[in-house]
């Protein structure tokens, strides 16, 4: 996460210019050549997505590429390119059903105002749920973030757009004004979300943990509790500021 998230709050996603229609716009009715998808075409597309998920669930040292997906799906590259322009587009299609579960998995926990007396419990519940979401989808989400860190614009936008609902709900929990995305409370939400994402990134990165010789479940628990405490303090502090009119 970065200052871009602050700037994106309350704005619509900018469309990326493409030479061909994206898979997202042609998902159910046409392939990328404009041909209407029949049952066979839909089955082929589903095979590609299933093959991608199989590779993501496999050994972490196996590189994920379009050619690897084509082999896994027993398809030629020409057939695969009928459905996806590139690896980014394919991964965005895989991410779509995953992110559709975000509301039930963790976002919904923020929609009801948290009582002051139980801020700590609610904060820990959110951090734990978000961590659980990452555990379920770790390799895919790590891959998205690595691509975003490498300045892949579509993955950067996906990462920001995935965080925005949580950030805006954090602003509401802090009694902030959603119409003022440049306000300090939005910056606090950005900082809290950045910390939350970083904590779950570190605690679900087995390569990093092995490199640090620290695959310690208790250590992960301490980190999650520390992040929950920061979230609690941030919300409590800004509620007090809002109540005092500052």
Q: What would you call each of these model-derived segments?
A:
Residues 47, 51, 55-89, 93:
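Helix-turn-helix
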Residues 56, 91-98, 144, 148, ...:
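Alpha-helical DNA-contacting segments of helix-turn-helix folds
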Residues 65, 141-145, 156-157, 212, ...:
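Short, hydrophobic secondary-structure boundary micro-motifs
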